[in-house]
Amino acid sequence: SHFEIERHGITALIGPNGAGKTTFFNLMTGFDTPNTGTWQFDGKDMAHVQPEKVARMGMVRTFQLTKVMSRLTVLDNMLLGAPVQPGEGMFRALFPGMWRKQEQANIEKAEALLERFLLIKKKDDYAGALSGGQRKLLEMARALMPDPKLVMLDEPMAGVNPALKQSLLDHIMALREEGTTVLFVEHDINMVRHIADWVTVMAEGKIVAEGQPKSVMNDPAVIDAYLGAHANVDLGDDSVLEDL
């Protein structure tokens, strides 16, 4: 009934399919409307706040199925995430001097992030031509355009090859080093145990356990909820996790 995210750390949200993890993300970011309950971000009430305003307030998210604009270039996809777009209005668009400097700053920031995520050579390609893993990188890079305080990643490792998975892991840990708070959903318990500072476990729409990774992985309620038929195994044993 109560969920908090520690600042400047990596919190993992885990649980079996259907536990409510993505629904929780949707509620927190304004994509769905809850029937009851309250929630705050950075001391501000977030009830009835629209998704685009949530992002401007510093809470951004990615999706299980990447949301890239296939018919826009990679660079244009990045620019969609820029928080300041003074040339969008009809009147201002007629006067380039009012927005050209900011637009150039947005482009420079986007290119710097594409360089960081090893996508700079793709900046002029259509986003639809990217591989699934590259789209994951693009979505994470775009999420950083508004300098968020909290980044919410919904299964960032799903469907990517081992090399890209390691790249994504490095980027997530780099965010923590930079002081950005990270909340991510993941099914790879072994990976969660190695990079998360705090773990929250959901099952059937409820929080069943939370704490540091080692203690959570040994919680009988977690083992029962998350592994079912494998409830007798030790989640702290790497060899067992590899077999699963």
Model-derived segments and their meaning:
Residues 90-122, 152, 170-173:
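Conserved ABC ATPase "signature" region
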Residues 29:
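Helix-to-loop junction immediately C-terminal to a conserved catalytic motif
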Residues 47-48, 113-131:
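Conserved ABC nucleotide-binding domain
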Residues 192-194:
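A short, surface-exposed alpha-helical micro-motif characterized by mixed small hydrophobic
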Residues 14-16:
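The feature captures the beta-strand-to-loop junction immediately N-terminal to the Walker
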Residues 37-44, 56-57:
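Conserved ABC transporter NBD signature motif
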